[in-house]
Amino acid sequence: MANPYHHAVSSARKWGGEPNDYIEIHEWFDETKAHFGDFRHRALRHHTEGIWLMQSIFGRTITNSAGRVIPTRWIGEQHVTEDLGRLVTVQDWLSCMEPQPWMNRSRRLSRELERETAGVS
């Protein structure tokens, strides 16, 4: 499924209510497409940590238009499973990333700050 609306339709079929009851959550998962246009956008939120983050933003439950209380984690798990076939972790994504030299070029800020403060009385 490529479109948040289709995920929302799937949620409505599964738990009742209308697609609009679910669309904001599904749009949140897929809004990273604005920054990276292919499937790799999913590495930012389509994992178990992303589901927990979504819950902290949208709350533990929503009440759909049919009056049913739905755990938001269920909605997140549905979205990720529909896109990836299973729930994955951040480790699943990052372990597939090939490290590049620029990723590990941190500055020694502690030394720089020590030198700066040593010269100041």
What name fits each language-model region?
Residues 1-121:
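N-terminal membrane-targeting hydrophobic helices
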